[in-house]
A protein has these predicted regions:
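Hydrophobic side chains within alpha-helical segments
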Residues: 37, 53, 89, 93, ...
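Short linear motifs at protein or domain termini
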Residues: 1-99, 209-221
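Conserved amphipathic alpha-helical segments that form helical-bundle/coiled-coil interaction surfaces
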Residues: 99-162, 174-186, 191-201
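Short arginine-rich
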Residues: 201-211
Length: 221
């Protein structure tokens, strides 16, 4: 069935806002006002309401009676749970993927890692990091697991983005990525699983620290 123009518009608004939330262009707590968004995207309120409803359903926005819709905050506990989900699933994905990775797959991942090392814009770093991991996990042939990981990454995105602004974190990540590729090339599925688990857990600790710092800052203000 062909989508209506309103559905197409809603999808476009949703994808744009989702990307802006995931990359912290729209920070937690930022208001998502229907009038402003309708004017910005040149659409009626109908597709905007649909897009906002989808963001709320995805856990990316919060709708409060008489207060409108805003970008959702994550509690430290919610972040921990999402990180636990990620390391469990990503560890399993790489474990399943390693036996099926060809030299061409490794070469493609290496190319992405080379691009990542040269990237200077945080947006580009974020995108290439995602593509690097996704290129490896795809060989696991577990679309539902991958979908769950993508959902968790999306919900963490507004906080995942911040660690990439630190050169120390970028350098550490580069070392871990190169080690992961060596393990994949050697066919060491268990070693790769352990490396991915360590990588995700470390990132998770940074995110929880950021959330706690923001919470303290709000309390002080």
């Amino acid at each position: 069935m062909k989508e209506s123009s309103s559905q197409v518009a809603a999808g476009s608004v949703y994808e744009t806002l989702r990307s802006e939330i995931a990359t912290a262009v729209l920070e937690p707590g930022a208001p998502l006002k229907q009038d402003h968004l309708a004017a910005r995207f040149g659409v009626s309120h109908v597709p905007v309401r649909e897009a906002l409803s989808r963001l709320v359903a995805a856990g990316l926005a919060t709708a409060r009676l008489n207060k409108g819709t805003s970008v959702a905050f994550l509690s430290a506990r919610e972040a921990v749970e999402l990180i636990e989900l990620r390391w469990l699933l990503e560890g399993r994905l790489i474990e399943l993927a390693v036996p099926h990775l060809s030299r061409a797959d490794i070469a493609r991942a290496t190319g992405l890692l080379d691009e990542l090392g040269k990237a200077r814009q945080v947006e580009e770093v974020f995108r290439l990091n995602h593509e690097f991991h996704a290129s490896l996990y795809a060989k696991a042939d577990r679309p539902l697991l991958l979908q769950s990981v993508e959902s968790a990454r999306l919900n963490l995105g507004r906080y995942l983005y911040l660690p990439w602004k630190s050169k120390t974190n970028v350098d550490r990540s580069e070392v871990e990525h190169k080690k992961l590729l060596r393990l994949c090339l050697a066919g060491d599925a268990q070693g790769a699983k352990a490396m991915v688990t360590e990588h995700v857990i470390h990132t998770g600790k940074l995110i929880v620290e950021i959330i706690e710092q923001q919470k303290t800052s709000v309390a002080i203000d």
